């Protein structure tokens, strides 16, 4: 069932939305090969050092894009999440544009108000969420990246393969 904003989309966007909604899994070639990279992100978050978190996150996303044979993503890790009366921003995906030759992901590692390092699982879900936007453009060749049920299932697919598999 489409989300409420679907009915306001133009026909061309509805077509993209429906295509996105049908894709539910991310088919990694070897998720177990990526588990050490996930552990490195966890260790980096524990260190509370932004540079460590950025390096580990970049290495993990590099391996994901290599396995999926798609262009790489530049990962930026920022400190405190921006926020306003409407909420706070956890991550941001910026596709390739005339200005940038590589797509970029920004992920915030500290909570907005308390300035605490975000929980590992929360950080990973945010990182995978932004990676899924990249997959929409580069792997699935969609002209836009909508938050569909399929999109969130793809995010969960990455999470299950790379975080839950490591916790078992």
Describe the role of every protein-language-model region:
Residues 158-168:
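Short helix/loop segments within enzyme catalytic domains
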Residues 140-144:
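A short acidic/glycine-rich loop-to-helix N-cap element
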Residues 1-51:
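N-terminal low-structure segments adjacent to metalloprotease catalytic domains
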Residues 68-72, 134, 138, 162:
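Amphipathic alpha-helical interaction segments
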Residues 49-103, 166-168:
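Auxiliary, metal-adjacent structural segments of Zn-dependent hydrolase domains
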Residues 122-131:
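Short alpha-helical catalytic segment bearing the HExxH-like zincin motif
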Residues 81-121, 134-137, 147-158:
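Active-site scaffold of zinc-dependent metalloenzymes
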Residues 2-15, 73-81, 99-110, 161:
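Short charge-dense sequence patches
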């Amino acid at each position: 069932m489409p989300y409420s904003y679907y009915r306001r989309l133009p026909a061309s966007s509805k077509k993209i939305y429906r295509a996105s909604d049908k894709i539910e899994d991310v088919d990694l070639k070897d998720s177990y090969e990526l588990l050490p990279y996930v552990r490195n992100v966890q260790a980096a978050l524990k260190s509370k050092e932004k540079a460590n978190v950025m390096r580990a996150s970049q290495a993990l996303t590099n391996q994901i894009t290599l396995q999926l044979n798609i262009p790489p993503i530049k990962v930026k890790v920022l400190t405190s999440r921006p926020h306003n009366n409407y909420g706070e921003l956890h991550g941001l995906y910026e596709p390739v544009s005339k200005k940038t030759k590589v797509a970029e992901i920004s992920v915030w590692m500290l909570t907005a108000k308390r300035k605490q390092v975000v929980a590992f699982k929360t950080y990973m879900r945010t990182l995978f969420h932004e990676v899924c936007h990249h997959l929409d453009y580069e792997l699935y060749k969609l002209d836009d990246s909508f938050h569909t049920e399929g999109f969130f299932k793809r995010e969960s697919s990455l999470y299950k393969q790379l975080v839950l598999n490591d916790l078992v």
